């Protein structure tokens, strides 16, 4: 593909890469560019900044969740209609699984996609020591992907002094600096960053960040770095990928090794429900998806994968709607912040009743993290106030005052839930996931086993049966296409 791309990465978390990324995207829009953005890793909130505030399409790319060919397809399928791709890194550039592996790191993603890197360095309180710091990162860069540096939280006077030394000693472009201004600090939440709609001055902050980037950083040189990788390969820059290639990329991204399903309902190109090409009156399953202020954490590719297989998504609000949508065949309750809206969720008694009745009638359902919390009898917030929830799971969910689970896991599915291996030697099916929660349940479930990829530590989790799958892990569907097939096939009995 011939769309320019660049990654904004950092020496460590809290260096300002999100501010720089958003400011850069803002300046691209000012230049009448049509950017698309990506977030390295599993965090939901940075893509929400890009989409909701800057109105730029964004999604996650994660080299733990996906293999090399899948990552490339997931990246390339977003490029049509865009003339530059901006990737925001995660943590420090080389911080991957367990903090010790390259897999899952920003650098691993940049190397997989062969995109250049601009390194953001928090230079606050530093002098010439910033040079050996940068030098160490360059030494680790086997593929020579780091093409420029931005010094954050430092004065222009210092930058003008140190920049010639950086370029002379390290042979790398010093692109500019961003002054240390308090109003540019984006408040933290317990997962990534605060939700965009909850920040009164967010637009002001991003506007100011864009102005500072334009004033103190060579934005044209940043764009040039994105394009330089193409020039070095002798490729020409084009504005968009051919649209006809997109369907093949989706097939590669969402199908994995699953090419033919055993069910007779399979039609067409890997769709379970293809009403266009089947020649029959197949009714696609309608999946109700909770989406509002309380339930907003969804991997874009999870939803698109359901649609890719032919499902129709119907969005609704557990906060504001009175009941579930009509004529649905499945339910998806994603993560978010139900604890911040517990009072409103409790007060919407008709919705709680609607969901409980539907699940008691065995409506196929998936619930993760915040959605899982909502299904409990009660939820107790950090102030100790207890609220009534949907009452589907006879248990309590409460704030623990500390991080309960954090990081990547592989979830081993119950035997027989999906098929894998051979009859003689069945192999457990696994789906990759991520956890990050300060709440815990008195009944986390025992139907699956979650295992940490580096340490091998494992524990039981998830409530799973023939019609539901509920638990704390945030699942990444493309890592196991058969899981999606299993869920959609469960919806058939309700059509």
Model regions: which residues?
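Cysteine-nucleophile active-site neighborhood
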Residues: 338-417
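ATP-dependent carboxylate-amine ligase catalytic core
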Residues: 2-19, 25-113, 121-148, 153-160
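Internal gly/pro-rich beta-alpha loop/helix module
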Residues: 127-242
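Acyltransferase
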Residues: 197-242, 265, 281-283, 291-295, ...
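C-terminal and late-domain segments of enzyme folds
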Residues: 282, 295-308, 312-314, 399, ...
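Structural motif
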Residues: 7, 86-88, 118, 150, ...
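Intrinsically disordered, low-complexity terminal tails and inter-domain linkers enriched
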Residues: 233-282, 417-428
């Amino acid at each position: 593909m011939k769309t320019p791309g660049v990654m904004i990465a950092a020496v460590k978390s809290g260096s300002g890469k999100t501010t720089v990324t958003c400011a850069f995207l803002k300046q691209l829009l000012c230049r009448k560019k049509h950017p698309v953005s990506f977030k390295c890793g599993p965090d939901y909130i940075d893509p929400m900044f890009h989409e909701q505030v800057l109105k730029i399409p964004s999604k996650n790319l994660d080299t733990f969740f996906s293999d090399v060919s899948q990552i490339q397809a997931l990246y390339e399928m977003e490029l049509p209609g865009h003339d530059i791709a901006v990737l925001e890194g995660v943590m420090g550039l080389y911080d991957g699984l367990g903090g010790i592996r390259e897999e899952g790191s920003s650098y691993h993603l940049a190397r997989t996609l062969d995109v250049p890197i601009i390194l953001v360095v928090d230079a606050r309180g530093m002098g010439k020591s910033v040079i050996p710091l940068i030098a160490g990162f360059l030494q680790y860069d086997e593929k020579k992907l780091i093409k420029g540096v931005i010094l954050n939280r430092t004065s222009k006077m210092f930058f003008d002094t140190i920049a010639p030394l950086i370029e002379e000693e390290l042979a790398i472009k010093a692109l500019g600096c961003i002054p240390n201004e308090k109003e540019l600090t984006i408040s933290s939440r317990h997962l990534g960053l605060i939700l965009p709609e909850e920040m009164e001055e967010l637009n002001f902050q991003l506007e100011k960040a864009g102005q500072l980037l334009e004033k103190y950083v060579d934005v044209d040189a940043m764009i040039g770095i994105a394009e330089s990788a193409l020039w070095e390969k002798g490729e020409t820059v084009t504005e968009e990928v051919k649209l006809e290639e997109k369907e093949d990329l989706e097939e590669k991204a969402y199908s994995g090794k699953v090419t033919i399903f055993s069910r007779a309902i399979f039609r067409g190109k890997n769709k379970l429900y293809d009403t266009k090409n089947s020649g029959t009156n197949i009714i696609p399953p309608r999946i109700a998806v909770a989406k509002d202020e309380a339930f907003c954490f969804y991997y874009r590719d999870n939803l698109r994968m359901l649609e890719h297989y032919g499902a129709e998504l119907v969005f609704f609000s557990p906060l504001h709607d009175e009941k579930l949508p009509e004529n649905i065949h499945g339910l998806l309750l994603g993560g978010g912040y139900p604890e911040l809206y517990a009072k409103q969720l409790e007060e919407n008694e008709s919705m709680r009743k609607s969901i409980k009745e539907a699940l008691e009638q065995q409506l196929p359902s998936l619930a993760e993290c915040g959605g899982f919390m909502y299904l409990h009898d009660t939820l107790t917030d950090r102030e100790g106030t207890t609220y009534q929830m949907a009452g589907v799971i006879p248990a309590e969910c409460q704030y623990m005052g500390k991080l309960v689970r954090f990081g990547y896991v592989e979830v081993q599915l119950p035997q027989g839930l999906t098929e894998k291996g051979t009859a003689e030697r069945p192999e457990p099916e696994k789906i990759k996931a991520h956890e990050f929660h300060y709440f815990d349940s008195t009944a986390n479930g025992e139907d699956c086993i979650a295992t940490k990829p580096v340490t091998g530590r494992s524990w039981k989790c998830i409530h799973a049966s023939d019609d539901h799958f509920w638990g704390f892990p945030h699942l990444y569907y493309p890592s196991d296409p058969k899981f999606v097939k299993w869920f959609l096939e469960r919806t058939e009995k309700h059509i």
